[in-house]
């Protein structure tokens, strides 16, 4: 079981990174993996805090989460004799730091500038390799440091997408239970309960999640970390990734302009909850209250891609059994579900 040793979320939290590293007994140089914009937003503050605490601090600027950039991070860390890595920014920077540090057998810190998905604290990363985005096993971060005064200034749609990613735990757990019954897959009651409870908290708090409120950012960060912990307990992503994530992964491949991961997972949850015979209206209403998209039009994706994703989703990670079964659903069934839920008109 891999869990972060420390999670700090609050206004101004990023300025304590140097002290946090000392309390974790880290030594030497830190390599900060970040993007051009996030360096200005948070990376420079992280570097200053590290230097004030007596650490060396260097940067690697990246744009995409690719194996090429992972290898660049590894090479630079070796060249600089860095002792630990810090992923500062969105999912791409954190995922690169996550995989590079795992391959180097180093600690890394996760310092998100947005709360858009549960990768900020998980032990899995999405990396582009050989033209495909693959999910890779990694180590969980040593610490997660989420500065809500920075996160709350990020585009609100990122926070809303984070809610969609958490809410998708509902159908992920249902799929996991189904796989356990039909395929004798390992099922952890504790991990499933934590994952479902996390989704329920976000749904029940939907009316309190608003733009510009640090309290909203803090609640979503805690939910994302909790979701990551559920995955760590399970030893897999099953508590937080089921048929709705498969649907999202297909959209990433086929849609000319995919929506955010959490947005697609949120809409996928509406569709898959309908297939499960559950309360899909509750999911839709919560997402709508939060301000996340609930239709293909709101995601900016044509109806035909929604239907194609629904019929092809079962092909993603076929070893993970879901409500879609081994053969998937027909185009006619997909259209019926999508129209019944209002995802397409």
From Swiss-Prot:
The keyword Lipid biosynthesis applies. Keywords: Cytoplasm, Lipid biosynthesis, Lipid metabolism, Metal-binding, NAD, NADP, Oxidoreductase, Phospholipid biosynthesis, Phospholipid metabolism, Zinc. Zn(2+) binds at residues 165, 245, 261. GO terms for biological process: glycerophospholipid metabolic process; phospholipid biosynthetic process. InterPro entries: G1P_dehydrogenase_arc, G1PDH, Glycerol_DH. Its EC number is 1.1.1.261. Binds 1 zinc ion per subunit. CDD domains: Gro1PDH (cd08173). It catalyses: sn-glycerol 1-phosphate + NAD(+) = dihydroxyacetone phosphate + NADH + H(+); sn-glycerol 1-phosphate + NADP(+) = dihydroxyacetone phosphate + NADPH + H(+). Substrate binds at residues 118, 165, 249. GO terms for molecular function: glycerol-1-phosphate dehydrogenase (NAD+) activity; glycerol-1-phosphate dehydrogenase (NADP+) activity; metal ion binding. One of its GO terms (cellular component) is cytoplasm. It is found in: Cytoplasm. NAD(+) binds at residues 91-95, 113-116, 122. Its main location: cytoplasm. Pathway: Membrane lipid metabolism; glycerophospholipid metabolism. Its cofactor is Zn(2+). It comes from the Archaea. Catalyzes the NAD(P)H-dependent reduction of dihydroxyacetonephosphate (DHAP or glycerone phosphate) to glycerol 1-phosphate (G1P). The G1P thus generated is used as the glycerophosphate backbone of phospholipids in the cellular membranes of Archaea. PANTHER family: GLYCEROL DEHYDROGENASE (PTHR43616), GLYCEROL DEHYDROGENASE 1 (PTHR43616:SF5). Belongs to the glycerol-1-phosphate dehydrogenase family. This is Glycerol-1-phosphate dehydrogenase [NAD(P)+]. It comes from Methanocella arvoryzae (strain DSM 22066 / NBRC 105507 / MRE50).
């Amino acid at each position: 079981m891999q869990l972060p040793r420390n999670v700090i979320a609050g206004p101004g939290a990023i300025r304590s990174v140097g002290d946090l590293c000392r309390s974790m007994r880290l030594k030497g140089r830190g390599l900060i993996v970040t993007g051009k914009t996030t360096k200005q937003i948070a990376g420079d503050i992280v570097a200053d805090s590290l230097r004030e605490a007596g650490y060396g601090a260097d940067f690697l600027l990246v744009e995409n989460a690719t194996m090429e950039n992972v290898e660049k991070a590894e090479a630079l860390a070796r060249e600089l004799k860095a002792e630990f890595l810090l992923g500062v920014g969105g999912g791409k920077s954190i995922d690169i730091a996550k995989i590079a540090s795992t391959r180097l057998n180093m600690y890394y810190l996760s310092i998100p500038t947005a709360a858009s998905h549960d990768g900020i604290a998980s032990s899995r990363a999405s990396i582009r390799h050989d033209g495909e985005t693959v999910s890779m096993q990694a180590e969980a971060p040593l610490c997660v440091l989420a500065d809500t005064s920075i996160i709350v200034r990020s585009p609100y749609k990122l926070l809303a997408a984070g809610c969609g990613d958490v809410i998708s735990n509902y159908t992920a757990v249902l799929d996991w239970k189904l796989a356990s019954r039909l395929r004798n897959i390992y099922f952890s009651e504790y991990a499933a309960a934590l994952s479902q409870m996390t989704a329920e908290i976000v749904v029940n708090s939907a009316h309190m999640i608003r733009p510009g409120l640090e309290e909203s950012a803090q609640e979503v960060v805690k939910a994302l970390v909790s979701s990551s912990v559920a995955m760590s307990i399970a030893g897999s992503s099953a508590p937080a990734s089921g048929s709705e994530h498969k649907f999202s992964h297909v959209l990433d491949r086929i849609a000319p302009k995919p929506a955010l991961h959490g947005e697609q997972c949120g809409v996928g949850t509406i569709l898959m909850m309908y297939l499960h015979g559950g309360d899909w209206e509750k999911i839709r209403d919560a997402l709508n209250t939060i301000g996340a998209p609930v239709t293909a039009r709101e995601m900016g994706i044509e109806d035909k891609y929604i239907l194609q994703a629904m019929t092809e989703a079962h092909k993603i990670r076929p070893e993970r059994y879901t409500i879609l079964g081994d053969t998937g659903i027909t185009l006619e069934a997909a259209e019926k579900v999508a129209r019944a839920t209002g995802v397409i008109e």
